[in-house]
Design a protein with these regions (language model features):
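Terminal amphipathic alpha-helical/low-complexity segments used for targeting or macromolecular assembly
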Residues: 1-159, 287-325
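Glycine-rich adenosyl-nucleotide cofactor-binding module
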Residues: 133-196
Length: 325
């Protein structure tokens, strides 16, 4: 991504604020990378508000919120997010594919966001929501999509060339490369995603990136770093396959396979049947992290986890399933 050499970002959008100025969400239709002299946000008024956004501003008394136009600048994306306006812009930059996961500093981002009731009428504050629900019911049925700090990506960004079978399964801040298909059981967290055409039928946890032409099989799991004290960032290389209900707590290089039902954590003891490792004692899987051309399998007789050489042609995706025009 050529524009990723830029270290700043700017955007104009619509923020939803409660009466105490808590930020429930911010939508930036056209964020940009570019130099910014300073970081911060400014509320726009009058002629400062772009014509296409003017009709979106104003109070929503039923929800108890005010919608305002804002201009937000970030001078240095390598610095942690300063506030919710900043945090939402970083999430938009990733989902708009202007930056890749890990390009921007996301330290402390979770704490900058507030818990929100996401409804078909827009974001609402959690405190007092039942009164809000009662007022909204006069407009029609009230659907609550979730109570969370992160909204669904597709309510803010719909990237070109992707298929998402269930919108609830992709958070704002996910990076879906052109040609990516996320099926009903797939899930992609924020600051994570795919770097090329991929099939996602399992879970891509926060911080995880998956290389081009890889397949995350049904129910497969890739360990993230949000909970459990984990610091290791997991990546999956190109042309890899995670079999159904498999999982990894190590990175895979290119052209690797984990057989269905096998979970390989960093501490899993592995009998290596490849190259210079072949005659050694079992090693911890963490020592194999990032290596290319390995098939991880469980010996059905001995029960031992083995790593054996895997063909260099790797995994081939069905092109028809990824022509997402």
């Amino acid at each position: 991504i050529g524009a990723m050499s830029a270290h700043g970002a700017v955007a104009t959008g619509i923020a939803t604020l409660t009466s105490d100025h808590t930020v429930l969400d911010v939508w930036y239709p056209e964020p940009e990378l570019g130099a910014a002299s300073s970081s911060g946000h400014a509320v726009l008024s009058g002629d400062e508000v772009p014509a296409e956004l003017a009709s979106l501003t104003g109070p929503d008394e039923d929800r108890g919120v005010e919608r305002v136009a804002v201009r937000v600048e970030i001078s240095d994306l390598t610095e942690p997010p300063a506030d919710a306006y900043d945090a939402y812009l970083r999430l938009h930059l990733i989902s708009h594919r202007l930056i890749r996961p890990h390009f921007a500093n996301m330290d402390g981002l979770f704490g900058k966001l507030t818990n929100v009731v996401w409804t078909n009428f827009g974001p609402c504050a959690v405190p007092g929501f039942e009164s809000v629900r009662a007022r909204l019911r006069a407009r029609g049925p009230v659907t609550v999509y979730g109570v969370d700090k992160f909204p669904r990506m597709v309510d803010y960004v719909v990237p070109s060339g992707v298929r998402i079978a269930d919108a609830d399964r992709v958070r704002l801040g996910a990076h879906l490369a052109e040609g990516t298909t996320v099926m009903h059981e797939g899930f992609v967290n924020f600051n994570a995603g795919t770097l090329g055409a991929s099939m996602v039928e399992g879970r891509i946890s926060a911080g995880v990136v998956v290389g081009a032409d890889s397949d995350v099989g049904g129910g497969a799991s890739i360990m993230g770093t949000l909970s459990g004290g984990g610091k290791e960032t997991i990546s999956i290389g190109e042309r890899c396959l995670l079999g159904a209900n498999s999982g990894v707590g190590i990175s895979l290089g290119d052209d690797c396979v984990v057989e269905a039902g096998l979970y390989v954590t960093a501490g899993t003891k592995v009998d290596v049947r490849a190259g210079a490792w072949a005659e050694r004692e079992p090693v911890k899987a963490g020592q194999l992290s990032g290596m290319d051309n390995l098939l991880f399998r469980r010996n059905s007789v001995s029960g031992a986890v083995e790593a054996v050489p895997w063909k260099r042609e790797g995994v081939e995706l069905n092109a028809d399933l990824h022509a997402n025009d």
